[in-house]
Amino acid sequence: MARTIVGLGDAKAVKKFSGMLAVDVSREMYWERKFIGKGRTASAPIMQLTELENDAGELITYDLSMQLTQQPVEGDEVQEGTEEELKFYTDSVYIDQARGGVNGGGRMTRKRTLHNLRMVGKDRMSEWWSRMFDELIFIYMSGARGINADFIYPTTWTGRANNAITAPDSSHLHVAGGHAKGTLVADDKMSLAEVDSALVKVKAMGGGTGGIPKMKPIKINGELHYVLVMSTRQASDMRTAAGTGGWLDVQKAAATAEGRVSPIFKGGLGMYNNVVLHEHEAVIRFSDYGSGGNIGAARSLLLGNQAGALAYGSPGTGLRYDWHEEARDNGNVVIISSSCIFGFKKTTYNGLDFGVMAVDTAALKIS
């Protein structure tokens, strides 16, 4: 039987590989696998907004309804006129197109068939997209680019799609040992005690009449949880400080939790005080802490509900990613590219962060 050759730019191949790329990126993307929930009511660290996947536009707005503060009307007192006006704070995220592609090489150096080039291109681009998304989310959630040398975005990067990278406000920044950036010392490392200290700050903050949005935990099977994502060094420091017995308790707590089947537990290190512990190599790092500006530090993220907003648009094909193939140099070179319309930002209401506490500790670079 003769073999069917699917030509460059074939509509069926384009649709197939566009869909395959979307599936692969979702599987490989760290934040997607664990911490993203769909819709405005999602109980997850990041809410995925879908309004612009089918409609035109570049901006999605979303509201936070503040807690009521009125005193109750007692007995036969007249209630009329005492009703409290609902108070809303609004945030928004812009979307824009991002693109990337691969060059299959010239005819004399290209040893692969078009089908194989598509497969290799899909594999490399899915890795690239997932890495780009993960690094971008860490940057936005941390409010800083940091010194991480192996990122796709350079250290001078200031954000995309009109979504500003905003530093943590003072209410949502915890520095180990009760210090500030300029007074951190090398011994102010990550520990379970620092988790307690940060959690106290989270629970005491917001609500009431102060106009500060209260950081809400993630609700799973009736249990309330937060998530802490640490750098590899911070996780190592925490294990060392906890000791063998203490760390075993942390692991047991996660294994016996009611919500242990939830995605936020997948790949976790354990749980302490209802905080699910994770580590990742893309956590933002710094090198200028301490009085001498020479202490290495890392910014772990203590995450509550809806700490970030991710929005997608559609390229007009009904698929999340657009896949494009073309020949250049008189047909000598095969180019395969992909694009995605999206935007991301840390949620902020009334000028304050909402669902994330930055936890900065000393963290020596792992050589």
Where are these regions (language model features)?
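Long, contiguous amphipathic alpha-helices that act as assembly "spine/axial" helices in icosahedral shell
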Residues: Y62, Y89-S171, K219-R233, G331-C340
